[in-house]
From Swiss-Prot:
Pathway the protein acts in: Cofactor biosynthesis; riboflavin biosynthesis; riboflavin from 2-hydroxy-3-oxobutyl phosphate and 5-amino-6-(D-ribitylamino)uracil: step 1/2
Protein EC: 2.5.1.78
Active site per UniProt: H74 (proton donor)
Alphabetical list of Pfam families matching this protein: DMRL_synthase (PF00885)
Chain sites annotated for binding 5-amino-6-(D-ribitylamino)uracil: F11, A42, L43, E44, V66, V67, I68, N98
Record's function text: Catalyzes the formation of 6,7-dimethyl-8-ribityllumazine by condensation of 5-amino-6-(D-ribitylamino)uracil with 3,4-dihydroxy-2-butanone 4-phosphate. This is the penultimate step in the biosynthesis of riboflavin.
Protein name (database record): 6,7-dimethyl-8-ribityllumazine synthase
Record-stated family: Belongs to the DMRL synthase family.
Cellular component GO terms, alphabetical: cytosol; riboflavin synthase complex
Coiled-coil boundaries: none
The entry's keywords: Riboflavin biosynthesis, Transferase
Length: 140
C-alpha cells in the first residue's frame, strides 16, 4: 500500500473541496493511503512537494488548486510557474499528478472539478498512481 501526499492551494474553498473529493476517492479506491496539506497558493505547491519528498515518507504527490484568470498578468505567472515547478520535480523521478486548474472563469472550474463531470482531482491522483507504477517498473 502506497502513501500519497495531496498538496492543495486552497483559495476557492468550494472548488478545492470538489478537487479534493475526487483525489481522495481515486486514491482510496486504488487501495492506497493519503495525507493532505494546504499551502497559501499555487506557487507554493512545488516547494511544498520538494520539502515533503526529502522526508521520504511519500510514494507520490497530487497537486491541487484553482487559478482563475483576472485582469492582470498574474494569472500567466502563477499558471506557468506552478506548472514549471511541478514539471521540474517530475524530472527528478517524483510521481506527481497535476490537478491545478487554470481556467477563465468559475463555471469552467466547476465543470473540471466535479466528480460527475471532468473530475480533474481524481484524474490527477490517477496520474500520480500511474507514474508511481512506471517508476517502480523502471527501477527493476
Amino acid at each position: 500500500m502506497a502513501k500519497l501526499l495531496i498538496v492543495e492551494a486552497r483559495f476557492y474553498d468550494h472548488l478545492n473541496d470538489l478537487l479534493l473529493d475526487g483525489a481522495r476517492t481515486a486514491i482510496e479506491d486504488a487501495g492506497h493511503k493519503h495525507e493532505t496539506i494546504t499551502v497559501p497558493g499555487a506557487l507554493e505547491v512545488p516547494g511544498a512537494i520538494a520539502m515533503a519528498a526529502e522526508s521520504g515518507r511519500y510514494d507520490g504527490f497530487v497537486a491541487l488548486g484553482v487559478v482563475i484568470r483576472g485582469e492582470t498578468y498574474h494569472f500567466e505567472v502563477v499558471s506557468n510557474e506552478s506548472a514549471r515547478g511541478l514539471m521540474a520535480l517530475s524530472m527528478d523521478s517524483l510521481a506527481i499528478g497535476n490537478g491545478i486548474l487554470t481556467v477563465e472563469n468559475e463555471a469552467q472550474a466547476l465543470t473540471r472539478a466535479r466528480r460527475t463531470e471532468k473530475d480533474k482531482g481524481g484524474e490527477a491522483a490517477k496520474a500520480a498512481l500511474r507514474m508511481m507504477e512506471l517508476r517502480e517498473k523502471f527501477a527493476g
